Amino acid sequence: MGKHYCDYCDVFLTHDSVSVRKAHNSGRNHLQNVREYYQTLEPECIQQVLDTLAQEYDLRGIEKPRDLLQPAGSSFMTFGAGPLSGSSDRAFRSQVPPSRMSMGGGVGGGSDRRGDSRGGSGGYGRYGNNDGSRDQGAPPNYSRPPPQGGPYSRPPPDMMAGGPPGISNGPYPPRGPPLGYGAPLPGAYPSGPPPNMRGPPPPLASNGSHAPHSRTGYGPR
């Protein structure tokens, strides 16, 4: 694939494709070179170029841009003070007809709910502004929480008396362990060792040998 040569910038692009040419033509250096080139031409030459471009749009059945409808030398043209001139967006929007600005279209934004035009991104902000900024304050349908000491700052009258509704106004009974987990009642378990448990070993005799075991398992009789 061959390389594309730009007459305005006097450079060869990496290759000739629609995406590469489009990216180059939208670059800042290319637009500046185009403006400088047309500023050196006479108004008659500029008008001839505009007429040629307008004929191409008519042959292809494409709607012509606004810049082609302006006379040569107009400050609204692309290489004058239009969107490609590098001037401020506010100066460019001031030349837009009022009918377009009042419809909310505008250039880069529209009219917000307060009536003034913004140059923001066009969408609505958090509370309704179309410039993407945030207002100071609450949204329209926001309800404030109840103040301190309001109707919900204290418990109901029955709860303040100390007992739940339907019960005498006394303090709550102390909380104990769950049912079945309290201390065992007296006599619940038999005293003494288990039936088949052997007793402790007998003491040593004077000669160092163990005394004979008893048959009951509880030491000598």
Swiss-Prot record:
It holds the Pfam family zf-U1. SUPFAM superfamilies: beta-beta-alpha zinc fingers. Keywords: Metal-binding, Nucleus, Ribonucleoprotein, RNA-binding, Zinc, Zinc-finger. A zinc finger (Matrin-type) spans 4-36. GO terms for cellular component: commitment complex; U1 snRNP; U2-type prespliceosome. Residues 178-190 have a biased composition (Low complexity). Residues 80-221 are annotated as: Disordered. Its main location: nucleus. Residues 142-158, 191-204 have a biased composition (Pro residues). One of its GO terms (biological process) is spliceosomal snRNP assembly. Coiled coil: none annotated. InterPro entries: Matrin/U1-C_Znf_C2H2 (IPR000690), Matrin/U1-like-C_Znf_C2H2 (IPR003604), U1-CZ_Znf_C2H2 (IPR013085), U1_snRNP-C (IPR017340), Znf_C2H2_sf (IPR036236). It is found in: Nucleus. It comes from the Eukaryota. GO terms for molecular function: mRNA binding; pre-mRNA 5'-splice site binding; U1 snRNA binding; zinc ion binding. U1 snRNP is composed of the 7 core Sm proteins B/B', D1, D2, D3, E, F and G that assemble in a heptameric protein ring on the Sm site of the small nuclear RNA to form the core snRNP, and at least 3 U1 snRNP-specific proteins U1-70K, U1-A and U1-C. U1-C interacts with U1 snRNA and the 5' splice-site region of the pre-mRNA. Component of the spliceosomal U1 snRNP, which is essential for recognition of the pre-mRNA 5' splice-site and the subsequent assembly of the spliceosome. U1-C is directly involved in initial 5' splice-site recognition for both constitutive and regulated alternative splicing. The interaction with the 5' splice-site seems to precede base-pairing between the pre-mRNA and the U1 snRNA. Stimulates commitment or early (E) complex formation by stabilizing the base pairing of the 5' end of the U1 snRNA and the 5' splice-site region. Belongs to the U1 small nuclear ribonucleoprotein C family. This is U1 small nuclear ribonucleoprotein C.
